[in-house]
Regions:
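Lipid interaction determinants
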Residues: 2, 8-170
Length: 170
């Protein structure tokens, strides 16, 4: 290829490169769209101010989160090692069984909104297994990397924060 051919080809190459870069940048979905779908729980930890981590729902917690396009969500987390009740009626557990259930399960649902600029999600909780959250608004910082969502929330009682890691369901 001589110099004249190269000079002619250079603008075409530059145009092609800019189109490829523009297309790649255009494929980055807004955070709200990246959040949509079903996620399974990886971990749910309390992180103290000194960095100490404690699993809130045990070593291998179970959970599912669902965020839909109309702005609704539901989140359920629980200990994987919960004992079964002695009888097969959920409303007739013993005091100890009911206590273990209350301490080993958290479910809440409502609507959500995303703030793209500060990477936060506001959860507008309509109902929760923990009654104090009914009607509450809670804000979480979130990060999305590939198929993983990490939510963090400040824990006022400990001075640390809660960190919940979710993975996109297959």
């Amino acid at each position: 290829m001589n110099r004249r051919d190269f000079t002619f080809m250079l603008p075409i190459i530059a145009l092609g490169m800019s189109l490829l870069v523009g297309r790649a940048l255009g494929q980055q979905k807004p955070l709200t769209e990246q959040l949509l779908g079903t996620l399974t729980l990886v971990s749910h930890e309390s992180v103290r101010a000194d960095g100490t981590r404690t699993p809130v729902y045990g070593i291998n917690p179970k959970g599912i989160a669902f965020f839909d396009a109309s702005g609704h969500f539901i989140i359920t987390v629980m200990r994987a090692d919960r004992a079964k009740y002695a009888i097969d009626f959920s409303t007739q557990g013993t005091a100890d069984e009911n206590k273990a259930t209350a301490q080993g399960t958290m479910t809440y649902f409502g609507t959500y909104s995303v703030d793209q600029a500060d990477h936060t999600i506001a959860l507008h909780i309509e109902g929760s297994s923990f009654p104090n959250w009914n009607g509450a608004d809670q804000k979480r910082v979130f990060a999305i990397a590939e198929d993983q969502l990490t939510l963090t929330a400040r824990a006022l009682q400990t001075g640390g924060y809660a960190e919940v890691v979710w993975k996109r369901a297959n």
